[in-house]
């Protein structure tokens, strides 16, 4: 039963992540297809650029929730946590893998949307939602660092890459040296080999950086568009 429940949750999280929020909002509010405007991306940054600040913020929040809400519900769903001491050693490695897979499923859904011919955004907001679901301190810090880098350098793509990298570094430092300070879920105390979970976040970050490949090339060539704060 639990195997079926997990499979259902994985598919549900993927489908939820697949909802092309920016595309839907663009068409509903301004009859604009983000795929044909600006950078062609359906994420929050292009929504800011094409639809304006108000709708860009809404797209960011909804994409954030695609990662934050489902994983938060799962992490506090007691059915999946081992309660009998005699079964903890057996169940914990499987639990670690379940959490790791569920953590990246909304990200994969956003990047490879079922409703957009398996194309999508770069999943920055969704990833931040996932991080925030178990450690709000690090998740919010990632948003703050993104804003700082964006103000300093003016490039949303560069700011996303730098902030994502810093968040991964903070996760490992917090795990190795700070006893998971700020973590709302007992990852270290109830799960064997929690490193698997952090490696899954690292893997997702590598995919995010790879999705910025064209942006990186433009940054190197000096042709990347700067973010317009005035719109």
From Swiss-Prot:
It catalyses: an acyl phosphate + sn-glycerol 3-phosphate = a 1-acyl-sn-glycero-3-phosphate + phosphate. The chain crosses the membrane at residues 6-26, 55-75, 95-115, 130-150, 152-172, 196-216. Pfam families: G3P_acyltransf. Keywords: Cell membrane, Lipid biosynthesis, Lipid metabolism, Membrane, Phospholipid biosynthesis, Phospholipid metabolism, Transferase, Transmembrane, Transmembrane helix. Its main location: membrane. Pathway: Lipid metabolism; phospholipid metabolism. It comes from the Bacteria. The keyword Cell membrane applies. GO terms for molecular function: acyl-phosphate glycerol-3-phosphate acyltransferase activity. GO terms for biological process: phospholipid biosynthetic process. It is a multi-pass membrane protein. The keyword Membrane applies. It is found in: Cell membrane. GO terms for cellular component: plasma membrane. Its EC number is 2.3.1.275. Catalyzes the transfer of an acyl group from acyl-phosphate (acyl-PO(4)) to glycerol-3-phosphate (G3P) to form lysophosphatidic acid (LPA). This enzyme utilizes acyl-phosphate as fatty acyl donor, but not acyl-CoA or acyl-ACP. Belongs to the PlsY family. Probably interacts with PlsX. This is Glycerol-3-phosphate acyltransferase.
